[in-house]
């Protein structure tokens, strides 16, 4: 298992406007993580205990629409 920012296939993390911890916790659990929250500094969902195969944010740029 690993911790990190879950992403779609385009290396774009999930934004949590309004610092919605419940949204991020559900999103993370739907991805089989243990839990999650909205990291306010980046306004992005952060997950704890994601499966190793689940993609997480890398240093590359977000490329919307590229799967």
Curated annotation (Swiss-Prot):
Any one GO cellular component localisation term in the record: extracellular region
First-listed, main subcellular location of the protein, grouped into a coarse class: secreted
Keywords: Amidation, Disulfide bond, Ion channel impairing toxin, Neurotoxin, Secreted, Toxin, Voltage-gated sodium channel impairing toxin
One GO process term, biological-process aspect: defense response
Disulfide bonds: 12-62, 16-38, 24-45, 28-47
Domain LCN-type CS-alpha/beta: from-to ranges: 2-63
Modification type Proline amide: residues: 64
Tissues with expression: Expressed by the venom gland.
One GO MF term attached to the UniProt entry: sodium channel inhibitor activity
SMART domains in alphabetical order: Knot1 (SM00505)
Entry domain remark: Has the structural arrangement of an alpha-helix connected to antiparallel beta-sheets by disulfide bonds (CS-alpha/beta).
Family according to the record: Belongs to the long (4 C-C) scorpion toxin superfamily. Sodium channel inhibitor family. Alpha subfamily.
Protein name: Alpha-toxin Tf3
Organism: Tityus fasciolatus
Lineage of the species this protein comes from: Eukaryota, Metazoa, Ecdysozoa, Arthropoda, Chelicerata
């Amino acid at each position: 298992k690993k911790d990190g920012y879950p992403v779609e296939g385009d290396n774009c993390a999930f934004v949590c406007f309004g610092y919605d911890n419940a949204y991020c916790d559900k999103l993370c659990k739907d991805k089989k993580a243990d839990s999650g929250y909205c990291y306010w500094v980046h306004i992005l969902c952060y997950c704890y205990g994601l499966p190793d195969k689940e993609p997480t944010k890398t240093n590359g740029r977000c490329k919307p629409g590229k799967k």
